[in-house]
Amino acid sequence: MSIPPGAPQPSYILRGHATPIHVAKFIRGNTRLITGDAEGWVVLWSLETRRGVAVWRAHGGVLLGVGEWGERGEGIVTHGKDNKLIIWKLPPSEEDSMSKILPVDTVSEERRKPWILHILDVNTMNFCAFAMCPIVTEVNPAEHEERGKDDEAQLGMEWEGESEEQLLIAVPNILTSESIDIFHIPTLHRIHNIPSPGPDKPGMIMSLSLFFHPITKCLTVISGYEDGSVSVFALSSPSTRTPSSPEQWNTIYQSKSHIQPILSLSVDPGRDRKFFITSGADDRIIKYLIPATTTPFSPSKSTSKSTTISSTKYEPKILKSAHAGQQGIEIRNDGKIAVTAGWDGRARVYEVTKMRELAVLKWHKEGCFAVAVADVLDRDRDEDKDGRSSVDGKGRELVGGIGYLDVKGKRLRKARETHWVAVGGKDGKHPISINITQLNRPPISESIHRTLGNIESQVPQLGEFQPAIVDAPADARECGEIPLDFVLREAGFQTVGSVGAGD
């Protein structure tokens, strides 16, 4: 396939799924990429070697969502169309015992699955993926037993004692797809139900987000609906609750700015949680402000006929991209760019502040359904006091000496520090591929272009790059020598707009 000069080109093509890829996410400090397909298969890829390190069939239907749980990244959450949400335990130390046979390769024996920690029966009628929010509470085991199941379901925010990892899961209600259920892990109890936001039925819930607001300190839920509207709910503040007025969910914001169903939403990953962005079946990418309040909103009309919002102060910013059907929107953790997967087979990169398109990633011939954006990591934060790097469940690397990295260490550091974007979909051919593009490679100078003809003699020294390991001949992979065409593919990448390493 010809690619326009200067356009972002794939750095790696990972092939292994036999059906369209519906979910993708970078985990463990960018050292792993997890993908899931239409038949329920999950593949955990190593970004260091670009190979699958764990393969299993998590669900009997299409994957709707994946997530990472736990301080050490040992928990993997999968949500399938088979009405199951499963939390698996797969620490890095157990990856060697997992199957490496990819879904496209059929085998007679069943592949080993990770240990199952929890299974939750959920509603998947509307294809809405779960939302999750980790919490850390202090639990006294003796008091835990005395309080019983009812109080246990209230999370015990005032308990004191031993620390315990817990999780909140938000999914559409089992009976009515316009309301939201929130479950507590590990008790599996439903602790909250949020009803439909108003008398006008907005249709099915299409996308969810769940978090604790940093200013109000209250649990907050954002939902996108089939009619193109969004609602923001906040649990009433503990300081305002009385015996006669128990906790309740207030709708603090509403807006209807999409003219087609909302397909995805992503919340500001920064500490302040100031905004969120949505994409839909229409051509609009919309940015909304999140009110820092728990007070119910007062409806008012905006200047736009298609928009009803809580106040003109929070009127959304609308970008008409002229490209309908963008889903899987994800904001990078530095809050500077957002990426979408398009039905037209294109992934698009947007600048969040100015809400403008920066780049179009073109590779797939048919629709793209999933996108993942690697975190921008702070190297200084991940190094210990003596200047050495370490490795843990999040993927930090172990270096043999101060200031020294061997070949493996360089590959691991590159995997962690590169600004990757992974795009998955259906190519119209087998096997299905995941397109991983690098956003921070510097432009190639003219002098380098003039000397590329002499680079072949230096190829054996460039084995650490392995720019196309999946496509490289087996003998080249084994000896570390990469043929010239693969080196050219790696060297030919251009920077994308203003999203370089200094952004």
Curated annotation (Swiss-Prot):
Major location (coarse): nucleus
WD repeats: 16-55, 58-98, 200-243, 257-298, 321-360
Assembly: Component of the ASTRA chromatin remodeling machinery complex.
Originating species: Sclerotinia sclerotiorum (strain ATCC 18683 / 1980 / Ss-1)
GO BP annotations listed: chromatin organization
Name of this protein: ASTRA-associated protein 1
Main function: Component of the ASTRA complex involved in chromatin remodeling.
Keyword annotations of the record: Chromatin regulator, Nucleus, Repeat, WD repeat
InterPro entries, A to Z: WD40/YVTN_repeat-like_dom_sf, WD40_repeat_dom_sf, WD40_rpt
Domain of life according to the entry: Eukaryota
Protein's cellular compartments: Nucleus
SMART domains the record matches: WD40
Cysteines engaged in disulfide bonds, as pairs: none
Family, as annotated: Belongs to the WD repeat ASA1 family.
Entry GO CC: nucleus
